[in-house]
Amino acid sequence: MRCPYCQFEDTRVIDSRLASEGEQVRRRRECNRCGERFTTYETAELALPRIVKRDGTREPWDEGKLRQGMLRALEKRPVATEAVEAALFRIRQRLRATGEREVSASQLGEWVMEELRELDQVAYVRFASVYRSFEDVSAFREVIEGLEKR
């Protein structure tokens, strides 16, 4: 690997460790020319499926968009960032586990709702109201009654 300090192409690995719950390898490297040390992270590049929207259009997986939607539902709620990241991680794992090239937006939405139900019930109702396009108060009531039965 090229040294970021002197651009020399020969470096050696001093230390390797697993990071991010085993999803990455963290490597400490040293340049054979200038002696500077730096850290690299190695991640397997796995293609996530495309998302098929309700209108039939297809979009590449966009974790930022999903995170933004979840955070909007969780706005001003007492949920730790780590819990949100863990939920996103589980959704990503489920996407990979399908083995499919495409996943419907409705399936993805159901997974998000499952995660939000566990994180925060208010956020779950918020997300469900947008995702399922609630028209009136009775739709809210049905979702809330469903939560109370659990």
Swiss-Prot record:
ATP-binding keyword on record: yes
Zinc finger (unnamed) residue numbers: 3-34
Obligatory cofactor(s): Zn(2+)
Highest taxon of source: Bacteria
InterPro entries attached to this UniProt entry: ATP-cone_dom, NrdR-like_N, RNR_NrdR-like
HAMAP family: NrdR
Similarity comment text for this entry: Belongs to the NrdR family.
Function: Negatively regulates transcription of bacterial ribonucleotide reductase nrd genes and operons by binding to NrdR-boxes.
Name under which the protein is recorded: Transcriptional repressor NrdR
Source species: Alkalilimnicola ehrlichii (strain ATCC BAA-1101 / DSM 17681 / MLHE-1)
